[in-house]
Amino acid sequence: MSRKTWIILGVMAALIAGGAYYVLGRDGGMQTVAAAPAKGYEPLPTDHTMGNPQAKVVLIEYASPTCPVCANFMLNFFPKLKRDYIDTGKIFYVYRTFLRGPDDAVAEKLARCLPKDKYMSFTDSLFRNQSKWDYEFGVPSPEGVHAALVKLAGEAGMNAADADRCIASTAEEAAISKVGEDGVAKYAINATPTFVINGQAQAGFEDFFGRLDRALSGK
């Protein structure tokens, strides 16, 4: 087994030991702004947010980089969400990564090692290029996943040596674990994507905009 394989497996083991949660089974561009208090919202230090922090509706999205349904939402539904709800100040949007497996952990570590203002654009790139790095799409091995993720990180400005060090580092593991722990404890998150609208969680995005509109109208 290669060194890179051991690095990836080591990341997974450390996260499990730290309390990270994983869902069994596998089912445009964004801007990061500073997190701010909003009604019914308890921020985590790692949150990435957009929109009006004083909005009457707070939307928290829990998504996994390896989740095809999450990618579908981010690529095909998020542009409308941003244009009609976030940019207009109707809602306060919070993005959180929820780990389903080791590939998510490696991807999230790389996202966190980039400058904060590149986190969401890299996350967007992960979804857009999911077929190039996620084993569900035929990437044959941990080494293949590693190489593909390092390449994507390189496109975001991180050199390969820094990417390898980032993946091997344990510095972000507690923060990564905390997101999963918090989601399970507060909202019983057990699948991705899950959307929490003013404290009410629902997996998937059936009637998504209808739910937002009802929350905005107070129904």
Protein language model features and the residues they cover:
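Hydrophobic alpha-helical segments typical of transmembrane helices
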Residues: 45-46, 77, 148, 179
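Soluble periplasmic/extracytoplasmic beta-strand elements of cell-envelope proteins
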Residues: 58-61, 92-95, 194-196
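A short beta-strand-turn-helix
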Residues: 40-57
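Envelope-exposed proteins and targeting segments
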Residues: 55-58, 89, 106, 191-193
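C-terminal cap of thioredoxin/glutaredoxin-like
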Residues: 1-29, 64, 151-219
